[in-house]
Amino acid sequence: MMNSTNKLSVIIPLYNAGDDFRTCMESLITQTWTALEIIIINDGSTDNSVEIAKYYAENYPHVRLLHQANAGASVARNRGIEVATGKYVAFVDADDEVYPTMYETLMTMALEDDLDVAQCNADWCFRETGETWQSIPTDRLRSTGVLTGPDWLRMGLSSRRWTHVVWMGVYRRDVIVKNNIKFIAGLHHQDIVWTTEFMFNALRARYTEQSLYKYYLHNTSVSRLHRQGNKNLNYQRHYIKITRLLEKLNRNYADKIMIYPEFHQQITYEALRVCHAVRKEPDILTRQRMIAEIFTSGMYKRLITNVRSVKVGYQALLWSFRLWQWRDKTRSHHRITRSAFNLR
């Protein structure tokens, strides 16, 4: 029986998911947890996935379809949270798949232990080949008892295999609303900041090592695109912004929770992503611009000041040396060029 105390609202941002969306929806309507509402936010789709969404909304009373002009997954998720009527909310990507007992497992955990968040493991799958592997190996992270949100976040980050993805859990809606936790419009990998802030506010969290979600990778996945030139520069700006936002969260919550070393060091890890992208960038001018932004944005300082271990400190110092070396080389090149052409 569905009531306000056991209801789950599943939020799906929909943008041109094609026929994969049908598989996603079939996995949701066959869930063993029946106290469920499914909220599809059509984010300006132009393909047949809109017709698929209409079919399910017309034929299943617990499926709702809302429309908005294309504004991105963050805006769609925020809107879904606003209209959700469940005690808990969950998020699904429109081209993924949910295993039949996912929400029964997580909601049972949440209700029995009065959790703010229940999270699970997931399988990652290449859509083209079918190759599948578990996201978090059990030798790195096992099922837990009830923890505080910060303690669970610390444990997950320490495993180095836990990922900031919102689709591996159910979240108490009141925690989101009370603390005004929003997905940031236009920010790629917005899950990183959102999950961090949610865990900072969660009093009771629990994790199961069961894989209950199937995340599909394909050639056009955002995380797998090989970017070069301006596309790479613009993409790395998102990670630079994430380092700033994470540092701001640590600062804002320092008087409310223990800011563990892992919360600092995740900033360094995100900064190192940008450094690796600089190294792989083939276009010299773009690389120079990326290096300049690392310094002017303050990311260079965040890379160094948030180190909390010898191993990561060594990596950060190595990259610090490289960045200064590259920047000095660029400046020397500019000076020589200007001198050769008698420029002032």
UniProtKB/Swiss-Prot annotation:
One Gene Ontology molecular-function label: glucuronosyltransferase activity
InterPro entries: Glyco_trans_2-like, Nucleotide-diphossugar_trans
EC numbers on record: 2.4.-.-
Gene expressing this chain: yibD
SS bond partners: none
Family matches, as PANTHER family: GLYCOSYLTRANSFERASE, GLYCOSYLTRANSFERASE EPSH-RELATED
Enzyme class, spelled out: transferase
CDD domains listed in its UniProt record: Glyco_tranf_GTA_type (cd00761)
Alphabetic keyword roster: Glycosyltransferase, Transferase
GO CC term (a single one): membrane
Biological-process GO terms, alphabetical: cellular response to phosphate starvation
Family membership noted in the UniProt record: Belongs to the glycosyltransferase 2 family.
Protein name: Uncharacterized glycosyltransferase YibD
Matches recorded under Pfam families: Glycos_transf_2 (PF00535)
